Amino acid sequence: MASQGTKRSYEQMETGGERQNANEIRASVGRMVGGIGRFYIQMCTELKLSDNEGRLIQNSITIERMVLSAFDERRNKYLEEHPSTGRDPKKTGGPIYRRRDGKWVRELVLYDKEELRRIWRQANNGEDATAGLTHLMIWHSNLNDATYQRTRAHVRTGMDPRMCSLMQGSTLPRRSGAAGAAVKGVGTMVMELIRMIKRGVNDRNFWRGENGRRTRIAYERMCNILKGKFQTAAQRAMMDQVRESRNPGNAEIEDLIFLARSALILRGAVAHKSCLPACVYGLAVASGYDFEREGYSLVGIDPFRLLQNSQVFSLIRPNENPAHKSQLVWMACHSAAFEDLRVSSFIRGTRVLPRGQLSTRGVQIASNENMETMNSSTLELRSKYWAIRTRSGGNTNQQRASAGQVSVQPTFSVQRNLPFERATIMAAFTGNPEGRTSDMRTEIIRMMENSRPEDVSFQGRGVFELSDEKATNPIVPSFDMSNEGSYFFGDNAEEYDN
């Protein structure tokens, strides 16, 4: 890990701030979520939403997407230069759900982008408040991570679907800034780089000319972001090589895929933040809570506290299980899609099931779905304990590259041991040891072979009672470690079929 001195905390990235002390960070993060809350309240007024309609997570998502679209300058410029029939580039919209005569009905609203920008700025003391926009993007990204497995995207770039725990933030837009880069997984960065290299191989002009120079700068910047996520010298040295390559091609792609595989054991440092839907901040602001004065943190007790007393509803399709829908949203709120299910279950206080056993589809409702049969139910987003979010891959001691947990990218800084079948993973590395980086490859493989599964990750770190806001009495949970607790695969359960 680079010395912490050179790193800004992710709250600072989140709020675009320079160095601040803890109180200033809490205040500026508070200002950010307070602005989101004020914006949401104003939008509910504009759209004449009742209290219950304003607490509907689907309405929250539509409003969030509208404001993100209003500030998407690149796309707006593109739309204005390439007008398509029947679409006004100056407007954006989406489905708003209202309660009419005991039924939920869908209404498509259209809104002026300029007007949305005005309302957003007004809620944020006249500023653009990019940090708040990024925060919403990360919430959407976390929801996607909990809902979908990006198997096809993996296969397209030549990666293995078993690497799904490296794919945090794979749907984050490019414009999500430093805060977005902090939450992207190793696999996500590798995938972005591979796509870029492939374009360069297919398009002779990709790296040439004035545009090519900018492309090259972007390529090197992405390499540096990925390098910063690795915690061992050999992995970093390999990234330097990929970055400095004169003409990136298949050799670099091979190296990147190798590095992604190595990250299954030698875990990268990926940040986790609890980003909640806008309506949750809106509810708190409406009840008179002053986020800026009280201060707020995305990685401490605050989001747990907020969810303890927020009532959020969701539309439920006829054959969906409301408890399963709640689990999906709870995981998204805490960025826990790649956390060990046993750790999540302990914190939540109810059993968290693998994705394959959930009878629920995504949160958003497609425009062709029948509203007649749609019900709504309250999402259960409360927890029994809280825990500090981590940015480390769960490596115990930085001196020796000890293992992180395979198929799990830890979200919570909670002690667990590392059950993994080293043979399974090492099988991924049979194949070509040749190539120009064979010495580094050998070094990385040696570290992986020497990492001991009996090591404990996050030694002594525990969870805390919700009354323990200063985190004074850690409770170290004990887990049945007989099997891996991966949400997407390591479950020994039957395949779930509808």
From Swiss-Prot:
Name of protein: Nucleoprotein
Gene name as annotated: NP
Electron transport among keywords: no
Top-level lineage group: Viruses
InterPro entries named in the record: Flu_NP (IPR002141)
UniProt source species: Influenza A virus (strain A/Gull/Massachusetts/26/1980 H13N6)
Subunit text: Homomultimerizes to form the nucleocapsid. May bind host exportin-1/XPO1. Binds to viral genomic RNA. Protein-RNA contacts are mediated by a combination of electrostatic interactions between positively charged residues and the phosphate backbone and planar interactions between aromatic side chains and bases.
Organism phylogeny: Viruses, Riboviria, Orthornavirae, Negarnaviricota, Polyploviricotina
Motif extent (Unconventional nuclear localization signal): 1-18
Processing after translation: Late in virus-infected cells, may be cleaved from a 56-kDa protein to a 53-kDa protein by a cellular caspase. This cleavage might be a marker for the onset of apoptosis in infected cells or have a specific function in virus host interaction.
HAMAP family to which the protein is assigned, alphabetical: INFV_NCAP
Region span, Disordered: 1-22
Family designation: Belongs to the influenza viruses nucleoprotein family.
GO biological-process terms attached to the record: symbiont entry into host cell; viral penetration into host nucleus
Compartment(s): Virion; Host nucleus
Function: Encapsidates the negative strand viral RNA, protecting it from nucleases. The encapsidated genomic RNA is termed the ribonucleoprotein (RNP) and serves as template for transcription and replication. The RNP needs to be localized in the host nucleus to start an infectious cycle, but is too large to diffuse through the nuclear pore complex. NP comprises at least 2 nuclear localization signals that are responsible for the active RNP import into the nucleus through cellular importin alpha/beta pathway.
